[in-house]
A protein has these predicted regions:
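His-enriched metal-coordination microenvironments in redox/metal-binding proteins
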Residues: 1-7, 27-33
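Short acidic-glycine loop/turn motifs at beta-strand connectors
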Residues: 11-18, 92-96
Length: 147
């Protein structure tokens, strides 16, 4: 098996689709992982309405989770492996999946418990990189002037 590949892309107004900023995932490209990455980005305070900025921070969240030096790439849609035989393309806007391409008509799923465990694990891998207070299941942005 080659991986669990996916591309996450976002449309920027005034820019042709082929130049849309995109993230390539070699692993963790299933819908539960992508939705968990997006949820964690929101919890971690990423400005999800600013497409280019939020894609950069989403890339950071994913890279912190994956670790190492492989398994993730960035570029424009035209240069991505969009029809990859795994999960295809997730088009996102404001931190939500709004469209799919090349998904082969199937979606990976996770139970609520599996999804919550994945979110917790992603947050654990990211908590030292973002100004967020973690108290059990509660997350709160830190006020930099508090401490």
């Amino acid at each position: 098996i080659m991986g669990n590949r996916a591309v996450i892309s976002t449309k920027v107004e005034g820019i042709p689709k082929k130049y849309s900023p995109s993230i390539y995932l070699h692993w963790n490209g299933g819908r539960p992982s992508v939705e968990a990455f997006l949820k964690c980005a929101k919890i971690l305070g990423v400005r999800l309405g600013d497409n280019q900025y939020s894609l950069a921070r989403l890339c950071q969240v994913i890279s912190n989770f994956l670790g190492g030096t492989l398994s993730i790439g960035v570029g424009v849609y035209a240069n991505m492996d969009t029809d990859n035989g795994d999960n295809g393309v997730y088009w996102i806007k404001n931190g939500k999946i709004v469209k799919r391409e090349f998904d082969g008509g199937h979606e990976q799923t996770a139970t609520d418990e599996e999804f919550d465990e994945l979110v917790d694990y992603i947050l654990e891998k990211n908590k030292s990189h973002f100004p967020v207070k973690f108290t059990g299941k509660e997350y709160q942005l830190k006020n930099e002037w508090e401490e």
